[in-house]
Amino acid sequence: MSSSPGDSGGTMLHQFRVANKMSRSIYDKMFVFPSMLVEEELGAEDTVVLLDDFIGTGKQVIDAWNLSFSELVAGAGTVYLMVVVARRRGREKVQAETELVVQTAHELNDSDDLFGDDCLHFTADEKRALKKYCKRANRTEPAGFGNCGLLIVFSHRCPNDSVAALHASHSKWRGLFPRNG
């Protein structure tokens, strides 16, 4: 969830409509752009559902909520944020700092942090080798934004909470799923 145009929320809305056989124009009235929510004159009996792909640290959602979304949905009864994947700590932070009710299909925990002690998918030697590559990709955030250490990639983009080796790009490194360019 972001207040920036062209973010992943639009991609998720399109995929949701196609997956649920709601892409025909007869369903258009059920879906509005976030900027048009204020025109809906929402009341306590109204429910708003926002769609997105991912919550990592929760910072992007909280910033967007504080910047504009809290005003756009003011007066609505319940506001849900439905995401495909959420990191547990990020989801909890969003729910504590906003009025959003977060629903997720897949929740990640500490064992999903590639470099964390709870991650059993890689040996200590493998983690050291991977960390070396991630530091080459991004010295300041080798484990990704918020030090999440995730291995998450979507068809439309790789979150910056994923390890840097996946998405970072510069003159000495090109990630497998670059975020820019």
What are these regions (language model features)?
Residues 4-9, 15, 66-181:
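PRPP-dependent phosphoribosyltransferase catalytic core
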Residues 5-47, 52, 56-63:
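Short, glycine/charge-rich flexible loops or terminal/linker lids adjacent to PRPP-binding catalytic cores
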